[in-house]
């Protein structure tokens, strides 16, 4: 997969290029990243990429000309039909389903805004989709872009050493992940790993993990549960959990 990054701070993407799973994917030629700095496409000696907002108001707005030139260059590099995604708090919320959808593209151009945002006419002329990583505001689109890239890259076949790592991730099946434990089996304070995980019975371990995924999602993200078509067995697990929870409260 090819990524084109429109950013005035391309150095920030060393975090993607140089570390972890994403760096390995780049080294293995499964991913390529090209950065296009709008400052390189300006026409004035100060390399100005922003200006005051028409109508007044605090903050500066990123200019149309350098951004459009950077996007055009990115399209020439990645392909004229490459989808342009603007990282914006006004966009649709990014989630696992959206990641899977974006993964269908061979290439993506990620536009990272700064200041008060970008000239609206640029969005009208070039942006195919606006995406938000949450209902909060950051200083720029670089961190959201890296978040989106990391999420997509780990879904690319063979990027992760064990394909089960992807399947067992939170949200892969619409549920949160189950609890994980490592050595020692018992901590000095007596806190021990659930016995089923030490049993070697893979069928029982799988049942325990499924139960934990359902309960954890129900407790922490009921909105996710409501969107799923649960099996009769899954529904029974949750019904039993609710009954046990009520009984436990009654005994306190």
Swiss-Prot record:
Keywords from the named record: Cytoplasm, Methyltransferase, S-adenosyl-L-methionine, Transferase, tRNA processing
Reactions that this protein is recorded to catalyse: guanosine(37) in tRNA + S-adenosyl-L-methionine = N(1)-methylguanosine(37) in tRNA + S-adenosyl-L-homocysteine + H(+)
GO cellular component, one term: cytosol
Keyword Ion transport: no
Subcellular location: Cytoplasm
UniProt EC number: 2.1.1.228
Gene Ontology process terms (BP): tRNA N1-guanine methylation
HAMAP family membership: TrmD (MF_00605)
Subunit: Homodimer.
Official protein name in the record: tRNA (guanine-N(1)-)-methyltransferase
């Amino acid at each position: 997969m090819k990524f084109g990054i429109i950013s005035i701070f391309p150095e920030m993407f060393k975090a993607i290029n140089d570390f972890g799973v994403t760096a390995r994917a780049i080294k293995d030629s499964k991913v390529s990243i090209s950065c296009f700095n709008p400052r390189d496409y300006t026409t004035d000696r100060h390399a100005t990429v922003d200006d005051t907002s028409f109508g007044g108001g605090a903050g500066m707005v990123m200019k149309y000309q350098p951004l459009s030139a950077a996007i055009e260059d990115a399209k020439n590099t990645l392909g004229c039909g490459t989808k342009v995604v603007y990282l914006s708090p006004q966009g649709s919320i990014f989630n696992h389903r959206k990641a899977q959808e974006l993964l269908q593209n061979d290439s993506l151009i990620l536009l990272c805004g700064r200041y008060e945002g970008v000239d609206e006419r640029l969005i009208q002329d070039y942006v195919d989709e606006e995406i938000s990583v949450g209902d909060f505001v950051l200083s720029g689109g670089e961190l959201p872009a890296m978040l989106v890239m990391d999420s997509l890259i780990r879904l690319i076949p063979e990027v992760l050493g064990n394909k089960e790592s992807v399947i067992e991730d939170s949200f892969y099946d619409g549920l949160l992940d189950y609890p994980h434990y490592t050595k020692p089996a018992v901590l000095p304070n007596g806190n021990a790993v659930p016995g089923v995980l030490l049993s070697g019975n893979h069928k029982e371990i799988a049942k325990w993990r499924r139960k934990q995924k359902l309960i954890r999602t129900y407790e922490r993200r009921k909105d996710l549960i409501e969107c799923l078509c649960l099996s009769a067995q899954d529904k029974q697990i949750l019904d039993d959990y609710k009954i046990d929870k009520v009984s436990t409260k009654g005994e306190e």
